[in-house]
From Swiss-Prot:
Extent of the Core repeat repeats: 83-115, 116-148, 149-181, 182-214, 215-247, 248-280, 281-313, 314-346, 347-379, 380-412, 413-445, 446-478, 479-511, 512-544, 545-577, 578-610, 611-643, 644-676, 677-709, 710-741
Biotechnology annotation for this entry: After addition of nuclear localization signals (NLS) and a transcription activation domain, can be expressed in both human and plant cells and will recognize and transcribe a target sequence; more than 17 core repeats are necessary for this function. The N-terminal cryptic repeats effect activation, while the C-terminal cryptic repeat is absolutely required. When fused to the FokI restriction endonuclease domain functions as a sequence-specific DNA nuclease in vitro (called TALE-nuclease, TALEN, PubMed:24792163 or BuDN, PubMed:25004980) and with an NLS, in human and yeast cells.
Alphabetical UniProt keywords: ANK repeat, DNA-binding, Plasmid, Repeat
Domain notes: The protein is composed of 20 tandem core repeats (the BuD domain) with 1 base-specifying residue (BSR, residue 13), which recognizes 1 base pair in the target DNA.
Cryptic repeat - repeat boundaries on the chain: 18-49
Protein name: Burkholderia TALE-like protein 1
GO MF annotations in UniProt: double-stranded DNA binding
ANK repeats: 216-245, 348-377, 579-608, 645-674
């Protein structure tokens, strides 16, 4: 093609306002000049069915002119068959996209008859070699079914670059791998990635050598089951001995290697480990940074940017937190780029770290900059924005809030509801699911607070769907709607519901009641806890634990780990004089496993400082008990200097959130003293669940409450019983109540009780209705 013709085509293609970088990217592909010419000649036709971004995506591959022509030829027919525009772009936007579109047209009917959905077909066709993959699925599906593979297995294997080769490889090597102990699930996991065929053959070749080096079958599957798994296995064999000499454990090597780009990450640990070590990064920190997608780049970026980040006030621990996720390199660079702008908008360093310290942290920071002002105009405060952005998928969550808030408002969801649902992993999907599934759930009798509780956790969208799917069956089994909400309103709620259905009969046969099952299942990780109870119950009984003990231990966040920790540590704790009741008391809370380990670790030092065994059990036997024990060790000397007795310290630390309460006493004690509160008052307010928040609320709202005629004693009474929420409720509704003739004495009497905030709201509700 002549230079003049190419130049002319560049000019014509530029009608799409292609930037120099975009034109260059297209031109570098095989047939790029032809693609530019095609775009310029057919831009009106293309624009009728594709967005600018779609055209660029398809054009960024070899021979893209053919793919774009195929979109024009096949797109309308595929649209009539139910394929979306994003499906068509996904199929066309790869090497061989034209052939893939034609293959979908030709084979979709036959694949549909075999039970493959439109989504399945788009997933398999939308990769390099998609046409060959669809044909291979048709040819090999019967053989796969005969060997016990499900349709989902076939789609997972086929739905990657080189899917056809992966399907053939599975049939070739599955018998041999099966003889070596690899399960069908292992084989699907290894094969179901780009380069799956090579990974399977590499497992076959290297497994004996890896086994001799001490790597388990689980390790091998973890390493092999990623894009580039074959290279990662070779790198483990080549670099493992040197890494072991450097002090890295086998488990650490497997963790670093077991991600996309694992081979490069291992090499980078060897190359940069010494330099990072000199800068003060520990081996554990290096492993944490390296053990993610893009770990090699993250290590290099830490080395490059650490000095500049430290100058900005970021500690090494915070740098590691931001770098130690998928996309950590981009997150660090984005922090450096955007931190000044974020600080100008009143985001604190802690906020920036929370947003950046997740998979996709870079995108989340950019979304905060982009959408923050609009969200503020909609009434969301900085804390709301940080809560929504500070999770995996935070960028998508912020975008979803902007897009869906008007409709959610129409459906009666409040701003706190939206923040609660959006502020988790998968928050964007949860908001979408609330809109799509909410009406059906309301028809079934679930209230708006129920829907928010179910949706407001990691996996909220799946939990809502599971409630719709399983509720009728669960009700037939005798579970009430409040039971269902309690089970699903946690991380992994969908799995917990399924586990209840699957395991309830066996658990009932073992003597567990329905309330027991709900208590165990109704926490984060409830599905695993139910299974662990089934697996470990006999061992617990043999050791003298009652059924009530098992339920108490299992019925919390992390119940599975707590059950295992009790079995592992009970003997040592018994040798140190802790009774079975003590062990159950410590283990039977959120984070019980960590609390048991902390008791073993810190008991000797605490004894030296005069704390009794009963003190230790009281401190450890609450949610966050491990942190509370550590906080006692850290702060006891300073608290002692300030006049707090050992009994005071135990009393403050021995509640949910005890660690935070001790820290709050240290932080706020002097100011509270200046405002007239004595040591006894401070202990009284701090020594409850949520004591830290109560002290902070007294500091913030105490002066205003004093101006309204409340005494110090009144404030202490409210804070010590109703806590921070009760103080805030008195602040908000006190004037309305006093206008209605209620005295301060009456208000304090109502607020200074457990649930005081709710009582105040109930008291004021009729008055607000009249206004």
């Amino acid at each position: 093609m002549s230079t003049a013709f190419v130049d002319q085509d560049k000019q014509m293609a530029n009608r799409l306002n292609l930037s120099p970088l975009e034109r260059s990217k297209i031109e570098k592909q095989y047939g790029g000049a032809t693609t530019l010419a095609f775009i310029s000649n057919k831009q009106n036709e293309l624009a009728q069915i594709l967005s600018r971004a779609d055209i660029l995506k398809i054009a960024s591959y070899d021979c893209a002119a053919h793919a774009l022509q195929a979109v024009l030829d096949c797109g309308p027919m595929l649209g009539k068959r139910g394929f979306s525009q994003s499906d068509i772009v996904k199929i066309a936007g790869n090497i061989g996209g034209a052939q893939a579109l034609q293959a979908v047209l030709d084979l979709e009917s036959m694949l549909g008859k075999r039970g493959f959905s439109r989504d399945d077909i788009a997933k398999m066709a939308g990769n390099i070699g998609g046409a060959q993959t669809l044909q291979a699925v048709l040819d090999l599906e019967s053989a796969f079914r005969e060997r016990g593979f499900s349709q989902a297995d076939i789609v997972k294997i086929a739905g990657n670059n080189g899917g056809a080769q992966a399907l053939y490889s599975v049939l070739d090597v599955e018998p041999t791998l099966g003889k070596r102990g690899f399960s069908r699930a292992d084989i699907v996991k290894i094969a179901g990635n780009t380069g799956g065929a090579q990974a399977l053959h590499t497992v076959l070749d290297l497994e004996p050598a890896l086994g001799k080096r001490g790597f388990s079958r689980i390790d091998i599957v973890k390493i092999a089951a990623n894009n580039g798994g074959a290279q990662a296995l070779h790198a483990v064999l080549d670099l493992g001995p040197t890494l072991r000499e450097c002090g890295f454990s086998q488990a650490t090597i497997a963790k670093i290697a077991g991600n996309i780009g694992g081979a490069q990450a291992l090499q980078m640990v060897l190359d940069l480990g010494p330099a990072l070590g000199k800068r003060g990064f520990s081996q554990a920190t290096i492993a944490k940074i390296a053990g993610n997608i893009g770990g090699a780049q993250a290590l290099q970026t830490v080395l490059d940017l650490e000095p500049a980040l430290c100058e900005r006030g970021f500690s090494q621990a915070t740098i590691a937190k931001m770098a130690g996720n998928n996309g950590g390199a981009q997150a660090l660079q984005t922090v450096l780029d955007l931190e000044p702008a974020l600080r100008k908008r009143d985001f604190r360093q802690a906020d920036i770290i929370k947003i950046a310290g997740n998979d996709g942290g870079a995108q989340a920071l950019q979304a905060v900059i982009e959408h923050g002002p609009t969200l503020r105009q909609h009434g969301f405060n900085l804390a709301d924005i940080v809560k929504m952005a500070g999770n995996i998928g935070g960028a998508q969550a912020l975008q979803a809030v902007l897009d869906l808030k008007p409709v959610l408002d129409e459906h009666g969801f409040s701003q706190p509801d939206i923040v609660k649902m959006a502020g988790n992993i998968g928050g964007a999907q949860a908001l979408q699911a609330v809109l799509s599934l909410g009406p059906a759930l309301r028809e079934r009798g679930f209230s708006q607070p129920d829907i928010v509780k179910i949706a407001g956790n990691t996996g909220g969208a799946q939990a809502l769907q599971a409630v719709l799917d399983l509720e009728l069956t669960l009700v037939e089994h005798g579970f009430s709607q409040p039971d269902i909400v309690r089970i699903t309103g946690n991380r992994g709620g969908a799995q917990a519901l399924q586990a209840v259905l699957a395991l309830e009969l066996t658990l009932r046969e073992r003597g567990f009641s329905q309330p027991d099952i709900v208590k165990i299942a109704g926490n984060s990780g409830g599905a695993q806890a139910l299974q662990a109870v089934l697996d470990l119950e006999l061992t617990f009984r043999e050791r003298g634990f009652s059924q009530a003990d098992i339920v108490k231990i299992a019925g919390n966040d992390g119940g599975t780990q707590a059950l295992h920790a009790v079995l592992d540590l009970e003997r040592m704790l018994g040798e140190r004089g802790f009774s079975r009741a003590d062990i159950v008391n410590v283990a039977g809370n959120n984070g019980g496993a960590q609390a048991l380990k902390a008791v073993l670790e810190h008991e000797a030092t605490l004894n030296e400082r005069g704390f009794s065994r009963a003190d230790i059990v009281k401190i450890a036997g609450n949610g966050g008990g491990a942190q509370a024990l550590k906080a006692v060790l850290e702060h006891e000397a300073t608290l002692d200097e300030r006049g707090f007795s050992r009994a005071d310290i135990v009393r403050i630390a021995g509640n949910g959130g005890g660690a935070q309460a001790l820290k709050a006493v240290l932080e706020h004690g002097p100011t509270l003293n200046e405002r007239g509160f004595n040591l006894t008052d401070i202990v009284e307010m701090a020594a409850n669940s949520g004591g830290a928040q109560a002290l902070k609320a007294v500091l913030e709202h105490g002066p205003t409450l004093r101006q309204r005629g409340l005494s110090l004693i009144d404030i202490v009474e409210i804070a010590s019983n109703g806590g921070a929420q009760a103080l805030k409720a008195v602040l908000k509704y006190g004037p309305v109540l006093m206008q209605a003739g209620r005295s301060n004495e009456e208000i304090v009497h109502v607020a200074a009780r457990r649930g005081g905030a709710g009582r105040i709201r109930k008291m004021v509700a009729p008055l607000l209705e009249r206004q």
